[in-house]
Amino acid sequence: MRKPIVPFDDIWKNVVNAAQALEPIPDALGDVYLVRNLYGTVRISVSDAVEGDESCLAALQRLARRLHEVLGAHGVLQENGILFVTDAFLKSIQGGKREVRPNVYLVDRLVTASDWWTVGEPPFPGKAARYTLYSVKGGVGRSTTAAVLAWHLARNGKRVLVMDLDLESPGLSSAVLEPDRRPDYGITDWFVEALVGQGEQVIGRMTAAPRWAQDFDGDVRIAPAHGRESGEYLAKLGRVYMDTDVDPWPVRLHRLLMSLENECTPDVVLLESRSGLHDIAAATVTDVAAHVLLFATDSESNWTDYRILFRHWQQHDLAEQIRERLSIVSALTPEFDTERYLQRFQEGAWDLFRDHLYDDVEAPDSADGFSFDLDDDDAPHDPLVIHWTRGLAAGASLHDLKHSTVSLAYASFLDRFDRLARAGSPREQ
């Protein structure tokens, strides 16, 4: 008879139970890493400095034997379950570690999605307020909203930098910039030129201002995905996300962001993120100290996808670090039965935040936790509302934004955004 399957989703639960039931580990052993590799099998990694220590080896063998017993096909034979590695290797895998008992850590080795594992401050913090426009699904109006926000902020005297980081589906520049005003270079050009030390030589030629912003008290600069001519766009795109020997992709993104902020000196930076759960989106959500506008519609598929992301943050103890950076956006709010739709949307958003990012406390100002009432209109789950209108349905309208059209669709959104901006992002507080 075959043994019952141990599915992938049960790996960490079984590993945690095995590690926590283990007798005390000798201090001489140092840190112990339980590493799930790309195939989903788990091995123990420790410093090769303890390889000859019999007491340490005995403790490791007990743990390896127990892991083999509880992991099924995701385990390995006891004799193959212990890896003695260099201290340099141990240091290289520490970024996504979780402690399950003193000096015992879980680590995932991933091809993608590893950037969702941490929430941190950028290595090169800027002076501008940063906002990321993100969604788990496309087609929810992020590009239009980036243009409207830039229009609104510039009319009120702000200097605004808009970066089109939805590189797999570029379109912001063509929707906002007239063909004769597009810059020579774009974001993909910077990434490939920076590989050979020419990044700073294109920075001054990769932003441009839309004609509709020329009479405003402020300023708008658009950094498009590509320049006036797309050139070998796919060949460049294939090199954008690579890690170099010196810097991983998120650090390269920070360098671009800082270079553009130094060049344009904006008050506000708007980052149009790629949609979905890929690492590329993660960098703009978790790593640039931006306030994140989460675009959603009231559909079960949207809430399901957001639950995947929120549950991940909850399980990896990241809720406290990320939750106050988030604000949900009701995108494409329908023209008819709007009140009932928004009530359902708010309840869905509250369920999402309450179940995964809020603490289970009665009062929002409790010293022991963090929570919000359903009807708290400054809470992350309370939506910034964008109304669907025919006037903004066509991308061409972004070349010539009209106050009446914007007011019809975005009046509520912009009022709430201004209140959010006055309160300040977590990085500024």
Residue ranges and their predicted role:
Residues 1-110, 114:
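Long, basic/Gly/Ser/Thr-rich N-terminal segments
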Residues 37, 54, 78-87, 227, ...:
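Beta-strand-loop-alpha "switch" segments that mediate conformational coupling across diverse proteins
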Residues 10, 55-71, 88-90, 156, ...:
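Conserved catalytic-core segment of NTP-binding enzymes
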Residues 126-169:
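Walker A/P-loop phosphate-binding motif and the immediately C-terminal alpha-helix
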Residues 381-429:
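C-terminal helical/tail subdomains of lipid-metabolizing enzymes
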Residues 148, 152, 175, 283:
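Active-site signature of alpha/beta-hydrolase-fold catalytic machinery across serine-
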Residues 167-262:
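P-loop/Walker-type NTP enzyme "switch/lid" segment
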Residues 113-125:
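Pre-Walker A adenine-sensing motif
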